[in-house]
Amino acid sequence: MTLTSNHEVGDADGNHVYRRITLRLIPFIFICYLFNYLDRVNVGFAKLQMLDALSFSETVYGLGAGIFFIGYVLCGLPSNLALNRFGPRRWIGLMMITWGIFSTCLLFVTTPVEFYVLRFLTGMAEAGFFPGIVLYLSRWYPNQRRGRIMALFMSAIPVSGLLGGPFSGWILNHFAAGQGGMAGWQWMFLIQGLPTVALGVLAFFLLCDKVEDARWLTPEQRQRVKTDITHDELNRPVQGKSSVASVLTMPFIWVLGFIYFCIQSGVYAINFWLPSIIKNLGFSDALVIGWISAVPYLMAGVFMLLVGRSADLRNERRWHLVVPMLMGATGLIIAANFATVPLIAILGLTIATMGALTSLP
């Protein structure tokens, strides 16, 4: 059974409604995701001072950076069940307050175990945020509009690198003298963690759990969105119920999982080690490292938006994923093989960042 909809992506009324939704929701969600990603990967910049200050080895850092994802994986499903139970507004706000506190507490770390525990807890707290936001946006945007919105939302990743790199470098330099009895890396965790707590509090007031609660839309506009979403649901291919066991026996699930694993491996190799790689190219000043690290993220942000728009206009997804993935792999190969030539290595890292991050939406 299908429902014929007269609401096409190009109609003026629909564009007005969804533009209004976008202006209301996306700026706040964008800022939340920016700090989500910054709190997750700012250890890459903290590493420039933290390892020497605490006598941590590269192994300790690598394990601490990676143990985040154990907590992330373990709590992903429970967190999204809780989101459905308590509603996006309350659960997203609570998640942000919690991981903001854990991320800020990294400034108190003195031993590897403390580092591991806080990174693990941060991963647990962040687990439901991204999938929760994806689910949340699916309640506001029909499928035909969602590609561009997801690209806009996820452009917070390169923006976090674009702004976070120079900002982190400035913090490390500015507080290098130990103002307030804290080192630069400690100030960085404090300055970048506390805003997340504040954003979590704001989420309770700025987000709506569902379209029906959006009093800033007229009744006609709310009905328009509900009709578009219903049209999507009724035209979705009907599939029988599947158990967890039956899903895990599907080969394509494992193939998709492997593809996603490869994408994320490239993304986080860049996020966690880009500052150190740039330092090893001969740049020692933290602010200079921050500005250089911003270049790949600037290019990735532009490329991500262009690819997201192209995918929607052409209603094509496969090649809009394959090409960025190939770019990411090519860029990493270039960077690895020209590690002693700074200009070419940075070019390779830029291509890798453009491809890897654009593969995510």
Model-derived segments and their meaning:
Residues 75-88, 302-316:
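Helix-to-loop junctions at the C-terminal end of transmembrane segments
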Residues 43-44, 243-304, 360-361:
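Extracytoplasmic gate region of multi-pass secondary transporters
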Residues 55, 78, 87, 108-114, ...:
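Helix-breaking motifs and short loop linkers at transmembrane-helix boundaries and internal kinks
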Residues 317-361:
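C-terminal transmembrane helical hairpin of 12-TM major facilitator-type secondary transporters
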Residues 148-173, 195-196:
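Glycine-rich segments within core transmembrane alpha-helices of 12-TM secondary carriers
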Residues 118-155:
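Cytoplasmic helix-loop-helix junction between adjacent transmembrane helices
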Residues 74-113:
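Conserved MFS/SLC helix-loop-helix module at the cytosolic interface between two early adjacent transmembrane helices
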